[in-house]
Amino acid sequence: MKLGIVGLPNVGKSTLFNALTNAGAQAANYAFCTIEPNVGVVAVPDYRIDKLAQMYSPDKITPATIEFVDIAGLVKGASKGEGLGNKFLSHIREVDAIIHVVRCFENDDIMHVDGEIDPVRDIETINLELILSDTEVLQRRIDRDTKAMKGDKSLAGDVQFFNFLKEQLDNAVNARAVEMTDEQRELMSTVALLSSKPVIYACNMSEEDFAGDLTENKYFNKVKEIAAAEGSEVLPICAELEAQIAELSKEEKEMFLSELGIEKGGLDLLIQKSYDLLGLMSYLTAGKPEVRAWTIKKGTKAPQAAGKIHSDFERGFIRAEVISFDELMKNGSMAAAKEKGLVRSEGKEYVMQDGDIVLFRFNV
């Protein structure tokens, strides 16, 4: 899974990326300090991995991972090549979802590219650039299919849908907010529209606001309204605070958050929201050689889940031996669970569940 972190210059985008990856991307108070996208691979926090590691004492522990890409700051006119627009748009096409960092803090020492704090305008600026780029892409597809329609009348429905979609974009509606059937959504996916990508608005606020009553931050409330209207996710975060937390040990982090009265760090919540947004979950494999989490789409059946490990597992799938994480923990060991007949044998139609611990049987 690849997530692109975007935002106007000086909204805290690179600070958030640094906190996520500890990759040390240069976070500077001027536009375009991130010219090439910095890429960081981040472990997905999962307490089940830790518990299984205690049980198995494995030689290797491999958590699920997410790839974060810090994409250069965007300005008005990017779709026409202003600023670093063309690079920005090409990099963002490659991600599965967008984390749009929005400035919801006031600080006279950190300039805003437009001179004043206005998250609604900032969101509209980026969304409009994505829409303008999409309009050009869509028009090229319409022209191509219209030409091909002379020899293939079955494309008429496609052209009609793409024209309808372009009308929505022309009215500044994000593709992801347009109501459509599953079949139409499948058709739209063949065009790779930027504004169709799922979005989490990360509201970067001051430490004081983040630890206090969120509803008192007027900027956060405005972003929540926008997210609700287009069916996107919104998450309050303090990038500066997360950068500090990222330097702490696990124990120090827990103590620090407890002192602030915060149950979970913003980054953990961001990763969880990303999973939810993309409809992802994890199953686990456990043994002395390795304890590992594997990321799959919700609704994935056992053979396809096995294929994440190796294509031979899917091709020669016989059955899956499955127990839930909670059931295993309750019984203390796999041997005890097997004695009680709690390890199930599941076939090709079994739909994997989050937290399943599984051993695949296969033959090729």
Regions found by a protein language model. Name each.
Residues M1-M111, Q139-R140, R144:
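Conserved G1/Walker A P-loop phosphate-binding module
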Residues K2-V6, F17, R144-V351, V358, ...:
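C-terminal-of-GTPase-core extension/linker across diverse P-loop GTPases
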Residues P9, I131-D134, A192:
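Flexible interhelical turns and helix-capping residues at alpha-helix boundaries
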Residues G12-F17, P45-S57, G85-D109, R121-L130, ...:
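Phosphate-binding glycine-rich loops and adjacent basic patches that engage nucleotide phosphates
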Residues F32, D46-I49, T62-F68, E82-V95, ...:
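Amphipathic alpha-helical transducer elements in NTP-driven molecular machines
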Residues G40-P45, A72-E82, R93-L155, Q168-T181, ...:
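Conserved Switch II/interswitch segment of TRAFAC-class P-loop GTPases
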